[in-house]
Regions:
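Membrane-embedded alpha-helical segments in integral membrane proteins
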Residues: 30-45, 65, 90-91
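N-terminal membrane topogenic signal
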Residues: 13-28
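Alpha-helical transmembrane segments
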Residues: 25-35, 80-89, 132-133
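Generic transmembrane alpha-helix motif of multi-pass integral membrane proteins
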Residues: 63-68, 89-100, 109-124
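Short, Lys/Arg-rich, polar N-terminal cytosolic tail immediately upstream
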Residues: 1-17
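Alpha-helical transmembrane segments and their interfaces in multipass membrane proteins
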Residues: 14-17, 36-60, 73-77, 97-103, ...
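Generic alpha-helical transmembrane segments
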Residues: 54-62, 85-89, 107-109
């Protein structure tokens, strides 16, 4: 098992590539694993098949980005695609389907916004920031003006667990970004 972890660390943390490339590798690999595990969990819980399909499609997409970044050394482009997909599509859809403001989703929005500044630079950072602000504003507008479009969680205890889990993951990932 230690050989596998050593190999993963060698792939993620390499001194021959930029810090942006290392962060991209970390985020895309971790995202691939997290979405695949989420897909298996969602399938095991018997939730809607479209949620399972979305998680597996997201895992495949992030895995392909990880592969393309490593293969073609286009880390800036792959990072922009990753952040645009995360902040412009995945997080807003998840916000609408997972409780909106009455969940841990606002913490994920913060993580998505912070990640922009770790991964992007120059015009990509400006474009990513604009995409993120528009997507977040749309979500908050929808939650305020059309709360009926939000799928809320079934109980208050589930909301609290979601907020705690989101806080722990957000803190862990932010610290990990700073470590790399």
């Amino acid at each position: 098992m230690s050989k596998l972890s050593d190999r993963i660390i060698q792939v993620l943390i390499r001194k021959d590539v930029s810090i942006h490339a290392q962060l991209f590798r970390f985020m895309s690999l971790l995202g691939t694993i997290a979405m695949a595990v989420g897909g298996v969990y969602t399938l095991a819980e018997g939730m809607e098949i479209k949620n399972v399909a979305a998680l597996f499609a997201g895992a495949l997409f992030m895995g392909m980005l990880f592969w393309a970044g490593n293969k073609f050394q286009q880390y800036d482009l792959c990072s922009f695609i990753l952040m645009s997909g995360l902040n412009g599509i995945f997080l807003p859809v998840t916000f609408l389907r997972s409780g909106g403001l009455k969940s841990g989703m606002p913490l994920w929005f913060v993580l998505g916004f912070i990640s922009l500044f770790f991964l992007l630079r120059g015009k990509s950072l400006v474009a990513g920031t604009v995409i993120t602000i528009i997507a977040d504003a749309y979500c908050f507008y929808t939650a305020y003006v059309h709360p009926e479009r939000i799928t809320y969680m079934e109980s208050e205890s589930v909301v609290y667990v979601d907020i705690i889990v989101s806080a722990v993951i957000t803190i862990f990932l932010t610290c990990a970004f700073m470590f790399i």
